[in-house]
Amino acid sequence: IEIICIDDGSTDNSLEILESYSDKITIISQENKGLASALHTGIKQMKGDWFKWFSPDDVMYSYTIKTLVDEAKKHSNTIVYSNWEIIDEKGNKLRAFHESNYNELSDFEYNIRLLDGQQINVNTTLIASSLLEKCSFRELDDPVAIDYDFFLSSALLCGISFHLISKSLIKYRIHSEQLSHENISKTLDYISEIVNRVLQKLDAHIRDRYIHELKQYQKTKSTKRKTMEFGLKLLSLTPSWVSDRILIFYLNKIRQNR
C-alpha cells in the first residue's frame, strides 16, 4: 500500500508527526491551496491502481482496504463505497450510519437519487485510478460540495456506476463546528449550483428526461413522507399496547418484503 500524505500549509505539528513516519509514507508539503488542490497533488503522485481518499482524523479497520479492493475488482467502471460509523472528537461512537442500498437500481434510477441530493461519504470510497482519468475533483470552497460535485459528474457526465458494501468500514469523526447552520446552508446552496451545472452539460433530451423523472421521484417522496407523518401522529393517539403491536406487525412485513 502506498500512503501519500499532503501537508497543505498546516500551522501545527502535523508535518513533524508525518516526518516521524517518513520511511513508510510519501510526504508532500505545500502552501495552503485548499482540499481540491491537495487531492490533485496526491493523485498526480500516486502510482497504484486504486485511489483512496482518507481524512486525517478518521479511522479505518484492519480489513477496510482489502474488503474495498476485493469488491471493486468485481465491478468494472464502478466506485465502491460502504456503510460507516460516526464518532465524536474523543473517538466515542455516536451511531452507525447505513447508506440507502440502491445496488439493484439501474444507473439512471441511481442518478435520480444523486440529483435529489443523495450523499456518499467519500472517506468510504475506493476509486480505480483509471476512473480518475475520466473525471476529476473540481475546486470548490466547501468540502462536502467537492465530494458531491465529483460523484454527480462521475455518474451523469462520465457514465460511472456506484456499488454499496453493506459492511461498516470507516469510523468518521465529526466535529461540532461541522453542524453549524451556516455551514449546512452553504453546502445546500452549493449542491443546488452543482445540480444545475451538471444538468446543463447534458444533451437536451437527456436533461429533460432527468428533470421529469426527478420531479416524479420527489413527488412520490413527498407523498410517502406525508403518509408516514400521518401514521406517526395516529400512533401517538393510540394506547401504547396497541401502537406497539401495530409497529411490530409492520416491521415484520418490511422484513418479509426485503
Model-based region annotation:
Residues 11-20, 59, 63:
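Acidic helix N-cap motif at the loop->helix transition within catalytic regions
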Residues 1-4, 13, 23-26:
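Short loop->beta transition adjacent to catalytic acidic/histidine clusters or analogous donor-positioning motifs
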Residues 7-16, 33, 55:
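A conserved acidic beta->alpha catalytic loop
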Residues 30-46:
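Glycine-rich, basic loop-to-helix element that forms the pyrophosphate-binding segment
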Residues 63-95:
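Conserved donor NDP-sugar-binding/catalytic core segment of glycosyltransferases
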Residues 55-59, 83:
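The conserved acidic donor/metal-binding loop of glycosyltransferases
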Residues 51:
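Short aromatic/hydrophobic "clamp" motif used to bind/position activated sugar donors
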